[in-house]
Amino acid sequence: MHYNAEQKSKIILKFGFNNIKNTGITEVQVALLTQRINALKSHFNKHKQDHHSRRGLLHIVTRRRKLLKYLKKSSVLRYNNLIESLALRH
């Protein structure tokens, strides 16, 4: 369910414009939240009655949605590139 530091640093490098310290960029934050959401999806396939963790998942999804809304408002091009690379919307 959890991801290690190596996976996290790969995401930061990919979406942080090749800078490992660039963790505050909206794209990096959304990508990290997306990875956490995907990890929780597999958890819920096993543990369908885990309502406490489901509430945490909803909190993470809300944070990602707010960040995506901010990114779309500030830069539509960066928003579209991120959506395409993470395959979030169809």
From Swiss-Prot:
GO function term, MF aspect, one: structural constituent of ribosome
Domain of life: Bacteria
The keyword Ribonucleoprotein appears for this protein: yes
GO cellular component: cytosolic small ribosomal subunit
Any one of the GO BP annotations: translation
Pfam families: Ribosomal_S15
Span of the signal peptide: none
Family matches, as PROSITE patterns: RIBOSOMAL_S15
CDD domains xrefs: Ribosomal_S15p_S13e
Protein keywords: Ribonucleoprotein, Ribosomal protein, RNA-binding, rRNA-binding
InterPro entries associated with the record: Ribosomal_uS15, Ribosomal_uS15_bac-type, uS15_NS1_RNA-bd_sf
Subunit structure: Part of the 30S ribosomal subunit. Forms a bridge to the 50S subunit in the 70S ribosome, contacting the 23S rRNA.
Biological function: One of the primary rRNA binding proteins, it binds directly to 16S rRNA where it helps nucleate assembly of the platform of the 30S subunit by binding and bridging several RNA helices of the 16S rRNA.
Family: Belongs to the universal ribosomal protein uS15 family.
NCBIfam families tied to this protein: S15_bact (TIGR00952)
Descriptive protein name: Small ribosomal subunit protein uS15
Organism, as annotated: Blochmanniella floridana
